[in-house]
Amino acid sequence: MSIPADIASLISDKYKSAFDNGNLKFIQTETTKTKDPKTSMPYLISHMPSLIEKPERGQTPEGEDPLGKPEEELTVIPEFGGADNKAYKLLLNKFPVIPEHTLLVTNEYQHQTDALTPTDLLTAYKLLCALDNEESDKRHMVFYNSGPASGSSLDHKHLQILQMPEKFVTFQDRLCNGKEHFLPTFNTEPLQDAKVSFAHFVLPMPESEETVDEDLLAMCYISILQRALTFFQDWLNENPELKKSYNLMLTKEWICVVPRSKAFSDEMKIGFNSTGYCGMILTKNDEVFSKITEKPELINDILLECGFPNTSGQKPNEYNY
């Protein structure tokens, strides 16, 4: 697993060059930190009109694979990771939600509905370890939007990596604070915050990076993914069109899976991917930005509309695990 020691500066230099040359678009007009008065869930709401230009799912011409095309101006590392050290490439996101937003892309075409492999997970975790910097308070998150209702816009398998906003504490951080790493059993469920509306499954990660390997990551991922996928069995009668979709988020501190029922809220004309389910809300529309900054409790309702009801306190057999 050879991730260059200077990976942070490689990303930074490539981003500066791509930004200066107009190869990517980043325009953020306003950011507001707020909190839901009922659930205490913290939100960082960013208004980003530049995202209007980002293609949505279904807008890419059939048969086209934008992530398969070589784009030297966006490529940080063309080949690394995996058994042959050629399994992945690291690209800059053409439509970054924060500066230096990157994509971990499989060099061989795989589908975004495919499960993550142990190698995918370990490569992502190693990137987190290389990029996080306690001295400068830099912390990163990897996320994977899988399935048509997850907020993913491209079919070529890719994970995304972004730096967490400074001093932003997610509800997953609070949930795992002071908790030791564990794997769920029939008697011990993954963590859920009973106050938030939507189903989510969270496990604390081990404190020591050295104890984290492919097996541990795969066991964490599979155990919470299985619980998320039970919702699709339970709800198929009610909604036969439902396609398996979920968001996965991984930091050095925790791993989280959120099952998804819809990519967009009909109620509010806003879409979410993984970032929304840890409180980072992106808006393209002025009216939506005004509404949710004035009444942040609306976000809890629309996150539920696009997810499934919270099962906190229920045993697996109570939701057909």
UniProtKB/Swiss-Prot annotation:
Record GO terms (molecular function): ATP binding; ATP:ADP adenylyltransferase activity; bis(5'-nucleosyl)-tetraphosphatase activity; sulfate adenylyltransferase (ADP) activity
Site (Transition state stabilizer) location in chain: 160
Keyword Coiled coil belongs to the record: no
Catalytic reactions of this protein: ADP + ATP + H(+) = P(1),P(4)-bis(5'-adenosyl) tetraphosphate + phosphate; sulfate + ADP + H(+) = adenosine 5'-phosphosulfate + phosphate
Gene Ontology cellular component terms for the protein in this record: cytoplasm; nucleus
PTM text: The N-terminus is blocked.
Active site per database record: 158
Protein name (database record): Protein APA1
Organism name: Saccharomyces cerevisiae (strain ATCC 204508 / S288c) (Baker's yeast)
